[in-house]
Amino acid sequence: MTLVPHVIANERTYPMPKRCAIAICLDGCEPEYLDVAIAEGLMPNLQMMRETGTDRIAHSVIPSFTNPNNLSIATGRPPAVHGICGNYLFDPDTGEEVMMNDVRFLRAPTVFSRFYEAGARVAMVTAKDKLRALLSAGLKFDEGRAIAFSAERADETSVANNGVENASEWLGMPVPEVYSAELSEFVFAAGIKLLTEMKPDIMYLSTTDYVQHKFSPQEQGAKDFYAMFDRYLGELQKFDVAIVVTADHGMKPKHDDNKKPAVILSLIHISEPTRQAEI
């Protein structure tokens, strides 16, 4: 199929990439994680990207959760346009809290789907399955040009639903624990194999923020994670690719140096002047 020179998604124009365009979303990657790891010599490949490429601090969308920001990356638009306004939604019709991982909540096409419609080969791997359906909306898996699966359910994939049969077996790696750094490593390893075998035009890799919730930038668990990522980044750079590394949101400690909760307390006066609530 002859590829068009550009595609339009949500009133924005994107050129068809001349080499595989890879977007990597490091979930919860506060910039300090990178600064510390680079300062300690743990991320030479990312350091080179910073020095020879473009390095910017970006604002996340509000609310600064995983689902809204991943979909803003995927659509190029804020939640007011794409409709994914949180990780969860209160459904007034049922009175229940619903996870916003269903395509029915998505109001705008993804950039990935527009490139796919234009004839591009599209691949994506997410750590958790909750994002996969949203990010892969509009892709078809019966033409051999799309693969989308999660590390979490890699052993449940099929050609009909994901473009690959049993991704865990295909990759030669067991499905990791959900709450582990290995879940994200599975994503990176899959990206390498997809570049080798599928040769996509567009690829999106999205991790989990288990490590970022568990470790501060100065702790060894975080340093090990970013050193691991940098090794895979070096492997990706051996291909003819253009790489963007970004995050969906940052991460801040919940406690101060004295182990006290880092929260802001406000006194709200309600109808009775002698009563007040702390939040």
Annotate the PLM regions.
Residues 50, 116, 237:
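Anion (oxyanion) recognition and catalysis
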Residues 35-79, 121-123:
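Short, structured active-site-proximal loop/turn typified by the sulfatase FGly-forming signature C/S-X-P-X-R
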Residues 268-279:
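Single conserved hydrophobic/aromatic residue that forms the stacking wall/gate
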Residues 76-216, 275:
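His/Asp/Glu-rich, glycine-adjacent segments
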Residues 214-219, 256:
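Short acidic, glycine/proline-rich loop/turn micro-motifs
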Residues 2-54:
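Active-site-proximal N-terminal segment of extracellular/periplasmic enzymes that hydrolyze or transfer
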Residues 23, 45, 224-264:
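Metal-dependent active-site segment of extracytoplasmic phospho-/sulfohydrolases and closely related
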